[in-house]
């Protein structure tokens, strides 16, 4: 399975083509749109999300509600394009029109792709960089992940997410499955503990009032994963390596860990390794899950726990120092409409990126052209965990 996205932040649309989805999966566009709506929410979001009404149109690969096994194409319209039609249109414009453009960018933002991207592709107007490097592209990635979540549901695999930390204010590291699921989306910062939600909102408001931004930590959990997905044989087939690459490819994500993560460095091995137990009904399992469901680059049947670190968004309303690439003079960086905190929305993006990586790994492990074939192979692998 693979996908390719196209489109600019203020262009007419985002387009994504997904290849390798098995045939005969029932797809309802409202299920995908429900996930798209979640991405637009969260405390700290900017005005852009008040303009956009992200919905998906499926234009290929699905017939009468079922996947065909051929490439699936989805389109997300950018409603804000109506305000950018001349500036972001494909049609040529005159030099006079170009000179009169008010949205040409020559003052790169620290922490963004602006300057290095301009150098790499020889763009003197850095809008050509920021339009594609914008996190707006994650709308297309959420559409892909939503499609993958439908596939995972067919295999009785659950995936969900939450916010663990915003601006140094932390929720608990771990919750049991029942508590986690029962409290999803209970507040607009996506934390389980309501008592710290207001403290997070206050922290976001403080950053916004100061023209600043804040980051945080999100967590994704995958439950009922069959054992042995991934491989210890080669580095590029390790499941945790694939998930890690997917997570750090999300805009502004600067770190990833699994289970206890970096805290494992503080403890002895006897407190980190998960003891192996056996039950005749469920087979092998672990007495704990410090390693986050992954051993030797493979799933071990325990919940996969992924933690992602998001830095503060680099667009600041109190801009940092920069340099105009035309005059080489010192200037404050460009101010572009942005969020003060996108961590709650980023937890949704991370969930869907992980969903894609899990679905992709399953289809690599169990080469299947249709969902019935895939289901049978998953049943057999789960039985192996009991009979081995």
Swiss-Prot record:
Its cofactor is FMNH2. Signal peptide: none annotated. Its EC number is 4.2.3.5. The gene is aroC. Reduced FMN (FMNH(2)). It comes from the Bacteria. Keywords: Amino-acid biosynthesis, Aromatic amino acid biosynthesis, FAD, Flavoprotein, FMN, Lyase, NADP. This is Chorismate synthase. GO terms for molecular function: chorismate synthase activity; FMN binding. NADP(+) binds at residues 39, 45. GO terms for biological process: amino acid biosynthetic process; aromatic amino acid family biosynthetic process; chorismate biosynthetic process. The keyword Nucleotidyltransferase does not apply. One of its GO terms (cellular component) is cytosol. It comes from Staphylococcus aureus (strain NCTC 8325 / PS 47). Belongs to the chorismate synthase family. PROSITE patterns: CHORISMATE_SYNTHASE_1, CHORISMATE_SYNTHASE_2, CHORISMATE_SYNTHASE_3. InterPro entries: Chorismate_synth, Chorismate_synth_AroC_sf, Chorismate_synthase_CS. Homotetramer. It catalyses: 5-O-(1-carboxyvinyl)-3-phosphoshikimate = chorismate + phosphate. FMN binds at residues 132-134, 251-252, 296, 311-315, 337. Pathway: Metabolic intermediate biosynthesis; chorismate biosynthesis; chorismate from D-erythrose 4-phosphate and phosphoenolpyruvate: step 7/7.
């Amino acid at each position: 399975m693979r996908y390719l996205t196209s489109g600019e932040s203020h262009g007419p649309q985002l387009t994504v083509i997904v290849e390798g989805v098995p045939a005969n999966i029932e797809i309802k566009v409202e299920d995908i749109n429900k996930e798209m709506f979640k991405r637009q929410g969260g405390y700290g979001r900017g005005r852009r999300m008040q303009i956009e009404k992200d919905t998906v149109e499926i234009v290929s690969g699905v017939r009468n509600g079922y996947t065909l096994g051929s490439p699936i194409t989805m389109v997300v319209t950018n409603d804000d394009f109506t305000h950018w039609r001349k500036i972001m249109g494909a049609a040529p414009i005159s030099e006079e029109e170009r000179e009169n453009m008010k949205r040409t960018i020559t003052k790169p933002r620290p922490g963004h792709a602006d300057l290095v991207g301009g150098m790499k592709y020889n763009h003197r107007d850095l809008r050509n960089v920021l339009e594609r490097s914008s996190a707006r592209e994650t709308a297309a990635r959420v559409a892909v992940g939503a499609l993958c979540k439908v596939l995972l549901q067919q295999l009785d695999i659950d995936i969900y997410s939450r916010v663990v930390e915003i601006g140094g204010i932390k929720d608990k590291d771990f919750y049991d499955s029942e508590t986690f699921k029962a409290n999803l989306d209970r507040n607009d910062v996506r934390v389980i503990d309501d008592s710290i939600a207001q403290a997070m909102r206050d922290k976001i408001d403080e950053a916004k009032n100061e023209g600043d931004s804040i980051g945080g930590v999100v967590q994704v959990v995958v439950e009922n994963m069959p054992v042995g997905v991934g491989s210890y044989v080669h580095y590029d087939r390790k499941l945790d390596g694939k998930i890690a690459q997917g997570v750090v490819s999300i805009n502004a994500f600067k770190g990833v860990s699994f289970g206890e993560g970096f805290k494992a460095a503080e403890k002895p091995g006897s407190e980190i390794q998960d003891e192996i137990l056996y039950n005749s009904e469920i087979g092998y399992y672990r007495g704990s899950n410090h390693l986050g469901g992954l051993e030797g680059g493979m799933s071990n049947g325990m919940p996969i726990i992924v933690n992602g670190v998001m830095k503060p968004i680099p667009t600041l309303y109190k801009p940092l120092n920069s340099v105009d690439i035309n005059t080489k003079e010192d200037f404050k960086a460009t101010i572009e409409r942005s969020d003060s905190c996108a961590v709650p929305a980023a937890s949704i993006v991370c969930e869907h990126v992980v969903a894609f990586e899990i679905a992709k790994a399953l289809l690599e492990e169990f080469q299947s052209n249709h969902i019935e074939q895939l289901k049978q192979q998953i049943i057999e692998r789960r039985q192996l965990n009991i009979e081995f």
